[in-house]
């Protein structure tokens, strides 16, 4: 009961008017001394140099200038002029968006810290769930039971008013919502806030924190409706009569949605969507929906999602956004792996009294394979090999010292070995390692102006020993190379719970 009351109190804290006083009053700087929020906002509370300007002090000075009407009169043929002050629109846009994003993140940080405080087990669990590999152990247990998987590309962009309405459910600050709406509409790239195309990616690149906040708000709303319809329960706990009234139009949309499905599928009701073995995973702007159901059920889910996006978010979804994969006939491209279900036949001899029977069974195993062709193409693009996978030297790194060259190649190899340690088949991973090893040797030989064979004979393995040993330390963990435990580890899958990002291969060029 106490835990429920504490959760209820934290949920109600979202209704406080927190954004307006934080922006317009001076005691915001006292938050810098709060150890709870020090890490998340201290960087924005400081006034930075001209190369990296992002400060709430500057944001507070910019807000009055935004509301001065004479700054908003801009000639149509002058797209580079700044509507916020006549200087650099990109700089001011970035400062205001970053300041707004860090403030609205405060309630979520408080809820998370309150949940993890004093609970070491939950803190460790939360840390492990942040890893990119944390999804694979879950799929390892469930994927083999799936018959169909829907590979879903989350739709975008969302209209600006939809985003403002989503935030209105938990931000009870009219001034803040007006400021947000004003800022969004005045941004010259407002029509592509969450569009990942290169031609319109200015906002997402220069305003990453704000971009992720808006995107996560949109995804959170979409998933909450999805869970609501799956469970046929109340959507988003209503704590006030205003919330209930705001949801009337939403329930009207749901009734209309059910009518559409009733006309399209006369025998289908919302109950048929309840699948006791339905699993949902979201990752990198995509999501997968796995089920043990039939093809008809997955088609119903597909059309349901399309109508949900159209009726609630007013988004048109092209057919290619949802792709259905049948297991085990096809594999799924999931987070850099080709994931599939393989049927391993086995024969069991059973004997009853004088009669013996042979029973043939097919065991479904979860398989993860390294996409060797994609990795070779990526290495070829980075000039480590040609398009056929033949290792070549890296001339750009030839001017570096031997230790730097070995360290760079070793870091790339360790990162790939670390991430693809969960592969069921190690042969492809060994091929990638071979390409990097020989490319390193060719680069060193090019630097010393000798052939690879002469270089290896002269220096033997002294220079490359550090490269190979450092690489194998990741795979061997604490086991020795000759131990049986390491031999089993080398053949099996290993998932790491400390991978929070994928290092860029070319970041050190």
From Swiss-Prot:
One Pfam family linked to the record: Intron_maturas2
MF (Gene Ontology): RNA binding
InterPro entries: Domain_X, Maturase_MatK, Maturase_MatK_N
Gene Ontology biological process: mRNA processing; RNA splicing; tRNA processing
GO cellular component: chloroplast
Swiss-Prot/TrEMBL keywords: Chloroplast, mRNA processing, Plastid, RNA-binding, tRNA processing
Stretches of the chain forming a coiled coil according to its record: none
Main localization (coarse): plastid
Location of this chain's protein in the cell: Plastid, Chloroplast
Keyword Chloroplast attributed: yes
Family, similarity comment: Belongs to the intron maturase 2 family. MatK subfamily.
Function: Usually encoded in the trnK tRNA gene intron. Probably assists in splicing its own and other chloroplast group II introns.
Name the record gives this protein: Maturase K
